[in-house]
């Protein structure tokens, strides 16, 4: 009987702890993560977001230094507007860079990223598809999306990431090769770019972010997802451990 009571008390403690953990770290009242996520997985999401915040700071510093035009998009932009930072379950950073600035950005990232970070594209990674709409990524070398794979289940380096897309200007219209469904944005919707809070620093967003989000998601972007969808679409993450296959496929990144 004592054992049953003890187990029951332990269960109650776990439930209370998980609820408190769910409702911390967020600006959204009465928020809870998906029941699919364990306490450890929630902790890893938060640690991963903290690391990617540092990565985004480095990226932003380089862009500001070299006058490179960029702005956050997709879930990262929703996070800015609704949370002034991360959507609590988001698993990466999404952004656009002006096509005229991309070559300059590539060279700056190759030279100026700190130890532990790496610029990945088809030129630096033989496993990266040349025709990928995501033209490049900034990767953390000491972390892993445990369940994520490339096209057809192929493995490539999958440390925590900033996804880099490019946008183009054509006769006053803004084109997004990575999302051709967005056709109604003009230069006035993008410029002037705005500096806004993201966690403990500032990032760049477009001038009319709500028009972009309404076009991409409809009006539903402003409402919180159903509870069962509040988990990273990238799957499980480990903020502090490199995937084992990284050492085998990318010895040049780890043997110096």
Q: Which residue stretches match the model-derived regions?
A:
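The feature captures the alpha-helical scaffold/lid subdomain characteristic of nucleotidyltransferase
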Residues: 3-69, 74, 78-89, 97-256
